Amino acid sequence: MKQYLELMQKVLDEGTQKNDRTGTGTLSIFGHQMRFNLQDGFPLVTTKRCHLRSIIHELLWFLQGDTNIAYLHENNVTIWDEWADENGDLGPVYGKQWRAWPTPDGRHIDQITTVLNQLKNDPDSRRIIVSAWNVGELDKMALAPCHAFFQFYVADGKLSCQLYQRSCDVFLGLPFNIASYALLVHMMAQQCDLEVGDFVWTGGDTHLYSNHMDQTHLQLSREPRPLPKLIIKRKPESIFDYRFEDFEIEGYAPHPGIKAPVAI
């Protein structure tokens, strides 16, 4: 995960001080890309411990089309708590857009099922895309999508994915995002009888919050360790039938966790 540490250093060296929606303040760069060959290991940051339980449960929650935090709470995941209303609702965020994008004539498009069908039946298509950025529903969302748009690509029997993330909290959010989409690529590849290829991450406003500077310097002082390996223990009937216990991370030996405040 040297690419991640290099990005941190780049933001420190080249970032512009900017104000932001949360009022915290950031150092920010615009436009950055990283590529992770998923054959080389599972891209889970090792210079601090990442909470893999939260990453897996959040992705399963997205794939169910759920937008209420009840499922997350049942599984001791609190990463969405700050944005939920008194009933636990978040509005039409990721899960809704992935699984039930509304059309003007009253139908709903299941984008995940659509891309699975494309991967199986038309893998050379240049339209194998999922978007969470629904302009017509942004004002109803508790938080506008940060990881907004992703595309799949098949070559030589391998499945790759590129994500465009319009806004990226490099210290807290990005390790989650990389691991989450890498996990999704593994799941989609298994469902389509493909090998995993690359995960390509592309960032827009890529920033470090001003109250994450000490934590960033601490993390940069640590030497990355070997990447772990993801094991998927079974192949479910569909992408929507995976369970938390289907996944195992082998060989994850990170440095200790580093706490930091969330900008709301």
Swiss-Prot record:
Stretch forming the signal peptide: none
Compartment(s) of residence: Cytoplasm
Alphabetized GO MF terms: thymidylate synthase activity
Pathway field: Pyrimidine metabolism; dTTP biosynthesis
Catalyzed reactions per annotation: dUMP + (6R)-5,10-methylene-5,6,7,8-tetrahydrofolate = 7,8-dihydrofolate + dTMP
Enzyme class at the top of the EC tree: transferase
Chain residues that bind (6R)-5,10-methylene-5,6,7,8-tetrahydrofolate: 51, 169, 263
GO terms, biological process: dTMP biosynthetic process; dTTP biosynthetic process; methylation
E.C. number(s) listed in UniProt: 2.1.1.45
Entry keyword set: Cytoplasm, Methyltransferase, Nucleotide biosynthesis, Transferase
Annotated Gene Ontology cellular component terms: cytosol
Pfam families hit by this protein: Thymidylat_synt
InterPro entries in the cross-refs: Thymidate_synth/dCMP_Mease, Thymidate_synth/dCMP_Mease_dom, Thymidate_synth/dCMP_Mease_sf, Thymidylate_synthase, Thymidylate_synthase_AS
Family affiliation: Belongs to the thymidylate synthase family. Bacterial-type ThyA subfamily.
Biological function: Catalyzes the reductive methylation of 2'-deoxyuridine-5'-monophosphate (dUMP) to 2'-deoxythymidine-5'-monophosphate (dTMP) while utilizing 5,10-methylenetetrahydrofolate (mTHF) as the methyl donor and reductant in the reaction, yielding dihydrofolate (DHF) as a by-product. This enzymatic reaction provides an intracellular de novo source of dTMP, an essential precursor for DNA biosynthesis.
Subunit structure: Homodimer.
Full protein name: Thymidylate synthase
Species whose genome carries this gene: Shigella boydii serotype 4 (strain Sb227)
Encoding gene per record: thyA
